Regions:
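Short glycine/serine/threonine-rich phosphate/pyrophosphate-binding segments
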Residues: 18-21, 42-45, 72-73, 97-103, ...
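Carboxylate- and glycine-rich phosphate/diphosphate-binding segment that chelates Mg2+/Mn2+
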Residues: 146-254
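ATP/NTP phosphate-donor binding region
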Residues: 1-89
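Gly/Pro-rich interdomain helix-loop hinge
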Residues: 266-306
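Glycine/threonine-rich beta-strand-loop-alpha-helix active-site module
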Residues: 73-175
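Glycine-rich phosphate/pyrophosphate-binding beta-alpha loops
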Residues: 138, 245-275
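Structural motif
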Residues: 10, 31-33, 60-61, 88-91, ...
Length: 306
């Protein structure tokens, strides 16, 4: 039986990645909806993108009412802005919440109905073009066909999926991660570690995902402590951005396992940051599956020099 491997159409990474992607972004449409959050507006991070759009003569509207654990109500409000402003493509600037929100808004803009309607279904209708610019090194959402949105009526986190949710362009520019505080750096970095290690020990692992997962694990162990101690270290931030991207590619194709399966309800019920809930479960979950993936855990240990 063969394997399928899905990635964004184009990936720009490293220093000045946004600038390198500028000409491509300008071809995606006439007016962008920039999906972001209040902190990215306050820090001026979103302005880095809107300045580029101004330079390229691309019109845009901004929807910045995204908070952690985005909800179906936020998606509905964002869709209203998208339609009212006659936008035809989307750019997300932020952590996993704005990127997941962008995907959900894009999906409903073409599929219709409410995002809640797609729980348990594969989203298949093509979306408008999407650009994902992460400001944390962890979620990997810029390289996945998944989005997680909270259903406010049922108080559950919905895992929604479909290849059409894969962003067309992923931009991992370390300049966007320099303002992440220590707490966010640690939590999102551990999220990336869980993505990579779960993908590597998954029954769905394949040769290509193995390469991405092991590369990510090695980078995370080397560079996450550096980023935590010195958030202004551009090289370390660049390597962590790349590691998060690699981990996202790995789990997008190999899936995550027991850690993420158990952490999702914790986040929904107690609103614990996603990376923290994963970290809380990591030791217990991997102890539980250790015997079934002994050789795989040995491989990971060798990669980090244990």
């Amino acid at each position: 039986m063969g394997n399928q491997f899905i990635m964004p159409k184009q990936v720009f990474y490293g220093e000045n990645a946004l600038k390198d992607a500028a000409d491509v972004i300008a071809t995606l449409g006439k007016k962008a909806l920039v999906v972001t959050d209040p902190m990215m507006m306050k820090l001026g991070t979103a302005q880095m993108v809107t300045d580029l759009l101004d330079e390229k003569g691309v019109h845009y509207a901004i929807y910045s009412n995204i908070t952690g654990d985005p909800t179906d109500k936020m998606i509905e409000a964002g869709l209203d802005v998208y339609n009212d402003q006659s936008c035809d493509f989307l750019i997300a600037v932020g952590g996993g919440s704005p990127i997941d929100s962008m995907k959900a808004i894009a999906a409903v803009s073409t599929s219709g109905g409410s995002i809640d309607d797609y729980l348990g279904k594969v989203i298949t209708v093509a979306t408008p073009p999407m650009v994902a610019i992460p400001t944390t090194s962890g979620t990997g959402s810029e390289a996945t066909q998944f989005t997680i949105i909270t259903n406010t009526e049922k108080d559950i986190k919905m895992l929604l999926k479909g290849p059409v949710l894969m962003p067309d362009i992923a931009i991992d520019d370390p300049a966007f991660t320099l303002t992440a505080p220590k707490s966010v750096t640690a939590a999102t970095g551990l999220d990336a570690l869980c993505h990579a290690s779960e993908a590597y020990t998954s029954r769905k692992a394949q040769p290509l995902t193995d390469e991405f997962a092991l590369s990510a694990i090695k980078k995370i162990f080397k560079y996450l402590p550096v980023c935590y101690k010195d958030g202004a270290n551009v090289e370390a931030r660049a390597q962590m951005s790349l590691a998060a991207l690699e981990a996202g590619v790995a789990f997008n194709n190999a899936s995550v396992t027991v850690i993420h399966g158990m952490s999702r309800p914790i986040g929904a019920l107690f609103h614990v940051p996603h990376g923290i809930s994963n970290a809380m479960l990591l030791s217990a979950c991997f102890t539980y599956v250790y015997d079934g993936a002994y050789d795989r855990f040995a491989d990971m240990a060798r990669e980090i020099g244990v």
